[in-house]
Regions:
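Short acidic/glycine-rich loops and adjacent helix/strand connectors
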Residues: 1-114
Length: 114
């Protein structure tokens, strides 16, 4: 792996926490996907419970991403899913977990956020 800049992607949609690091040629350097837990017999998750689970999963996923050989110091951009649909007013609380993490990382390492 050469020293090109990498991209960090974060998604906290309703039923899965995802974090990935990719190279500009599409090579996947790191890929984390973890389904949220739904209690047996339940039909789904309330937004508050899903948000809580994302907040619990993101630190470990991001720590593992940055500990992957060759990643630290090479993130050139951060991307995040910020809402369920690309229309004005589209909102679900679960997306705030990923958006908060992505904004914090992008600001702290001085890279663009998409």
């Amino acid at each position: 792996m050469n020293k090109e800049m990498l991209s960090l992607g974060i998604d906290t949609s309703n039923y899965k926490t995802s974090v990935a690091v990719t190279a500009s040629d599409g090579e996947i350097i790191f890929n984390y996907q973890s389904f949220l837990k739904v209690k047996s017999g339940e039909r789904g998750l309330r937004q508050s419970e899903a948000l809580f689970q994302h907040v619990q999963k993101l630190p470990e996923a991001l720590e593992n991403a940055f500990e992957t050989k060759g990643v630290r110091g090479r993130i050139g951009a951060v991307s995040v899913s910020a809402r369920p649909r690309p229309v004005k007013g589209s909102y679900m609380p679960v997306f705030t977990a990923g958006l908060s993490a992505a904004r914090s990382i992008a600001a702290s390492i001085g890279v663009p956020l998409y």
